[in-house]
Amino acid sequence: MYDIGEVILETKNVSKHFPASGGRTLIANNDINLKLYKGKTLGLVGESGCGKSTLMRMLISLDEPTSGQILFKGEDISKLKGEEKRLNRQYIQMVFQDPTSSFNPKMKIRDIICEPLMNFGRIKPSEKD
């Protein structure tokens, strides 16, 4: 059997439900199971409104799942709070769908890339050049 490597990020039965008008529930994600392997790339595609961004927001801890687990290096990160949650963000980040609204056009690309690295003490300001 081919060994595809270490699982770095995994979702187990992750669901996200939102309250809707009339006492209804909008199901954005329902029992999502996926594995991301260290050093590999995974593309997530689907129709507009199918829940891709909602899933990504949960993976980077901007939203909490209604149910299920999100495991990073085997540890459940879906319920992290406060400083633990902030520190975990140094390992999982994303560029949103419209990078032109996510990035400051007055900043150099180098500065955009280095900013989160400096925020988490991964590099010193003097090292960004």
List where the protein language model places each region.
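ABC transporter nucleotide-binding domains
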Residues: M1-D129
